[in-house]
Amino acid sequence: MTIDFDKLQQAINYQFNDLKLARHALTHRSANKFNNERLEFLGDSLLGFLVAEFLFEHFPEASEGELSRLRASMVSKSALVEIALDLNLSEFLLLGDGELKSGGRERESILADSVEAIIAAIYFDGGLTACKQLIISWS
């Protein structure tokens, strides 16, 4: 399967300098050993950090507990799935045949993981500021 990179970039509101990073972020382990799992790992941490920073700056009166609860809800699997659905990321996922046949495009864990992987790909492509701007635009 090929990815319509123009459509992807329009959907996520980001223009990649290196389209290989975008392809890597959307490649599930069922499709290739060169997959998005490591990007997902980094993207999870980037997302947590950037959301924490955003909340810290925008809610100066909030307690640590309140900030933690807000962050948890904003980086939850359900929140990431909602972002993936809003961006129609399932259309761009590269999945193996077995995963496709078993409904992988709708699997919440795959959708949430793809959002985290895209965040890391954007970090490598455009830096932390690009990630921050994108995450804010998605919220």
What are these regions (language model features)?
Residues M1-S139:
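RNase III-family endoribonuclease catalytic core
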